[in-house]
Regions:
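Peripheral membrane lipid-binding modules
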Residues: 3, 10-113, 124, 145, ...
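Active-site substrate-binding loop specific to GH73 endo-beta-N-acetylglucosaminidase modules
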Residues: 117
């Protein structure tokens, strides 16, 4: 199917309005569930309401329509505190290939903040999948031309201005 392949999931950061800590700072992490896989970011240590994760996970998906995301405050002593959750719709990702969005986290019917997630979809290979094929070929051709097609232009176009710089660089 056109909707089977790899879903690259990048929970980037969050802006939270709910604070679970009376003392000290929150160490929040995100838990993402899709296609039978569960991923957890590292707790953003002492980053409070502005956790910055910048992590990347890869899930195999097959037409999955929703990814569930929940944010918790990691607690060493008691159970982790629940901050909020959202459902990330995946319908768009199969055609658009990559999206970058803020999603509202809900807790007990109220917004508890927002989470930024970048998604990329890489379709499984196969003749039926022209999009995937096209991307593959498109990637290869510039690589091939790099040696032949690009070099003369770099040589002719750039050579004269860079000659002086080149020598200047080499001498010291």
């Amino acid at each position: 199917s056109m909707q089977s392949g790899q879903l690259v999931i990048k929970p980037v950061s969050a802006q939270l309005t709910y604070d679970s800590e009376w003392f000290g700072s929150m160490d929040c992490y995100a838990k993402l569930t899709v296609g039978g896989s569960v991923f957890k970011t590292r707790p953003a240590h002492d980053q409070g309401k502005h956790p910055n994760w910048q992590e990347t996970f890869t899930a195999m998906v097959n037409g999955d329509q929703v990814m569930h995301v929940a944010v918790y405050d990691h607690d060493n002593v008691t159970a982790d505190d629940y901050i909020g959750e959202c459902q990330v719709p995946l319908q768009d990702i199969y055609s658009r290939r990559n999206t970058s969005n803020w999603y509202t986290l809900m807790r007990k019917g109220k917004s508890s903040g927002q989470i930024m997630i970048i998604l990329e979809f890489v379709p499984s290979g196969g003749m039926g999948n022209m999009g995937g094929m096209g991307m593959g070929m498109g990637m290869q051709t510039p690589g091939m031309n790099m040696g032949m097609g690009m070099q003369p232009q770099m040589g002719y176009g750039m050579q004269q201005p860079q000659m002086g710089m080149g020598y200047g660089m080499q001498q010291p």
